[in-house]
């Protein structure tokens, strides 16, 4: 049993089906639901929302965890994107509010070693740049 055993996603649409996988370890791609592909020179956004589109709850600390229910699949996707990102963009309010999961290890601690090795192989750096929007 590994830290990825409780994460099994399913790819619904693969718009980049002709593009090559970025080369993640097999267990990470299996948890993702297949090959992980990204187009070059694009900005990717990832956040959770409630059924009515709310992405943050006023006055609730770590409201995204409240909205997502702390689902390991959501944390896994966040970690995966951070493992391959050049930069993570965060608002200054979020930065001031709490220490966030700016790295893959922070987003999905159970997979820290796997994501750390994947990032080193793909990006060649320990962590993405943190870009703060003010």
Each language-model region and where it sits:
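Active-site ligand-binding patch in enzyme domains
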Residues: 2-51, 55-134
């Amino acid at each position: 049993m590994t830290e990825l055993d409780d994460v099994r996603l399913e790819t619904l649409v693969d718009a980049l089906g002709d593009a090559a996988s970025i080369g993640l370890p097999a267990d990470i791609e299996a948890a993702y639901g297949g090959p992980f592909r990204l187009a070059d020179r694009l900005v990717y956004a990832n956040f959770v929302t409630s059924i009515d589109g709310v992405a943050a709850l006023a006055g609730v600390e770590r409201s995204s965890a409240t909205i997502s229910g702390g689902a390991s699949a959501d944390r896994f996707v966040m970690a995966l994107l951070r493992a391959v990102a050049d930069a993570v963009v965060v608002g200054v309010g979020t930065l001031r509010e709490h220490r966030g999961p700016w790295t893959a290890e922070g987003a999905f601690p159970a997979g820290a070693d796997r994501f750390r090795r994947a990032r080193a192989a793909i990006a060649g750096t320990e962590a993405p740049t943190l870009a703060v929007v003010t």
